[in-house]
């Protein structure tokens, strides 16, 4: 999609949310709060919850595209959905294959302008995907070393822990 189409989609999503009734907004916001429950249900029986998974994936893809084209934007529900999908990524690997590549691309190109909490959520997600062996050390370590340039003490601590953990596993 081109950037003009993305802007139209973003405007449409914003317009739809702004024009929701209070009940619809509560339902949408409640959907984010129920992610841990859905994660547990998916872990138990993933085929029964495919419809809910797809619904949330559609929302997440829209938010992912917004972040891809406007990386300095912070979306709270994006962070929650990102961690949710990272936790269940081993259950739906083909549907969620775009996440690691997209996160690496966003962080490589825009790590200095991404808001602090978004960077932390993205690094947490990549770390979780790495622990699930959905990413190799060769895919994340160069990025993690590059991210050490950020003037973010919490992020640097997290990155050092991830790097040391990966290097320890490699050397065993």
Give the label of every model feature segment.
Residues 2-150, 163-171:
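Alpha-helical solenoid scaffolds in large eukaryotic transport, assembly, and signaling factors
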Residues 155-156:
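Eukaryote-specific intrinsically disordered, low-complexity regulatory regions enriched
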């Amino acid at each position: 999609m081109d950037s003009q189409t993305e802007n139209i989609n973003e405007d449409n999503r914003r317009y739809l949310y702004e024009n929701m009734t209070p009940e619809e907004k509560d339902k949408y916001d409640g959907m984010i709060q129920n992610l841990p429950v859905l994660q547990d249900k998916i872990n138990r029986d993933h085929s029964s919850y495919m419809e809910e998974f797809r619904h949330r994936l559609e929302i997440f893809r829209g938010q992912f595209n917004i972040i891809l084209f406007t990386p300095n934007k912070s979306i709270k529900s994006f962070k929650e959905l990102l961690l949710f999908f990272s936790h269940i990524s081993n259950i739906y690997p083909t549907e969620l294959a775009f996440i690691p590549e997209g996160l690496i691309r966003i962080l490589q190109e825009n790590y200095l302008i991404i808001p602090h909490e978004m960077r932390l959520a993205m690094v947490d997600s990549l770390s979780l995907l790495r622990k699930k062996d959905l990413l190799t050390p060769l895919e994340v370590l160069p990025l993690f070393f590059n991210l050490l340039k950020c003037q973010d003490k919490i992020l640097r601590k997290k990155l050092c822990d991830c790097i040391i953990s990966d290097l320890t596993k490699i050397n065993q």
